[in-house]
A protein has these predicted regions:
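Individual transmembrane alpha-helix segments
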Residues: 65-91
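Transmembrane-helix boundary motif in ABC transporter permease subunits
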Residues: 1-6, 83-118, 131-138, 185-187, ...
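Membrane-interfacial helix termini and adjacent extracytoplasmic/periplasmic loops
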Residues: 40-47, 110-111, 127-166, 199, ...
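Hydrophobic positions within alpha-helical transmembrane segments of bacterial inner-membrane proteins
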Residues: 26, 85-97, 101, 127, ...
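Short membrane-interfacial helix/loop motifs at transmembrane-helix boundaries
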Residues: 24-72, 233-237
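Transmembrane alpha-helices
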Residues: 13-14, 19-26, 166, 172-179, ...
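Short hydrophobic faces within alpha-helices
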Residues: 78, 103, 120, 178, ...
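N-terminal signal-anchor/first transmembrane alpha helix
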Residues: 1-32, 114
Length: 237
């Protein structure tokens, strides 16, 4: 066995262990949900059942909790989280793409400063971002008086979308930067020399090239928003 072959085998084993460690708890919890046993566990396995999705478990105070299918609060929370995630994707992807494109156009001396400012939101704790968003928009709503500004400034879903977008757009920015680093700028120059406008170059050359990054950043933004807690718990009023 060659050293290269041995390295590939060891790498495969390492990756398998890594993903097993990462997704193992999720797999165990998913399997446990279909065990009809009173105590949530894989062993002893009584029988495959949808019991806990329908009737739920008994709480410590003796009351029976609603099952997954009947838990209205869970349904409302899921729909709200989905709506917020879609809103964050709608804002974060264009913001990240625009910032990455600007980064490639600014002067080299300003590029480091612009890059540092663009990634700065991820350095702040989510708690700080959530509280800051609420405080800022509360002041704006107070100064705006009655009207749409006042309503938006006290709308939890709106504030949560803005708060999450502050740092999730940075993730999108980094994805677009990585993609643009491999972009051949001579394609734009050739198109401009042939009479294409800046809009045509952007739509027909740059956007198709960035489509993989757009898809990746949209997925990352959706997942980051859907599982976020620190920012959401302080901004969702």
């Amino acid at each position: 066995m060659t050293s290269n072959r041995a390295f590939q085998i060891l790498l495969g084993i390492y990756i398998s262990i890594f993903f097993l460690y990462l997704f193992g708890p999720l797999i165990i919890m998913s399997v446990t949900a279909f065990n009809s046993a009173e105590f949530p566990s894989i062993t002893p396995w009584e029988c495959f059942s949808f019991r806990w999705f329908n009737e739920g478990k008994i709480a410590y105070d003796g009351q029976r909790l609603a099952g997954l299918a009947a838990d209205r609060d869970l349904h409302v929370g899921f729909i709200t989280s989905l709506f917020i995630a879609l809103g964050v994707v709608t804002l974060s992807v264009p913001i990240g793409m625009s910032a990455a494109i600007v980064l490639t156009q600014v002067h080299s001396k300003l590029r480091t400063l612009f890059y540092s400012m663009s990634i700065m939101p991820v350095l702040f704790p989510g708690v700080v971002i959530g509280i800051s968003t609420v405080v800022l928009w509360d002041r704006i709503a107070t100064l705006g008086g009655e009207g749409i500004i006042s309503e938006l400034g006290r709308n939890g879903i709106f504030l949560t979308i803005l708060g999450q977008t502050c740092f999730i757009s940075t993730y999108c920015f980094l994805i677009f930067v990585a993609r643009l680093q491999r972009f051949d700028t001579t394609q734009e120059e050739a198109a401009l020399d042939l009479g294409a406008s800046q809009t045509q170059v952007f739509v027909k050359i740059l956007i198709p090239y960035l489509m993989p990054a757009i898809g990746s950043s949209a997925v990352i933004a959706f997942l980051a928003s859907f599982e976020n807690y620190n920012t959401t718990v302080f901004s969702i009023l």
